Amino acid sequence: MAARRVRPPGGVVFEDDLFVAYGFPEPNPLPGYVIVASRRHVRGLYDLDAEEAAALAPLVIRIQRAQKSALGADHAYLFVIGDRIPHFHAHVVPRFPDTPPRLRGGRVLQATEADARPVEEVEAACRALEAALRR
């Protein structure tokens, strides 16, 4: 997303000079599931410079707090894997009281098309996150 200019469902919810945060591409199993990607091309977390590293945790915390306050999540996960896409990105994933066990914790990363939420629901969640992150 940072380099390709592809618009995923929900679009961009936050951006600055260092990072861009956007709704997880389809199939999105949980409304408010966000990817945070570095603007600068780096392979992994270990390649972030000092400024990027110092900015990442506060940004993730803001997103997780917005997932709780704006969407009603009762918890939020952070995953950094880097196996399939050779560009730094983090998964910031809300968990809701009614999130099924098969989508809790790391299992959410194995979601299938059958788990996809309606695009309208994903879009609405991203707009709510975007508004919360502007406050």
Stretch-by-stretch model annotation:
Residues M1-R135:
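HIT superfamily nucleotide-processing domains
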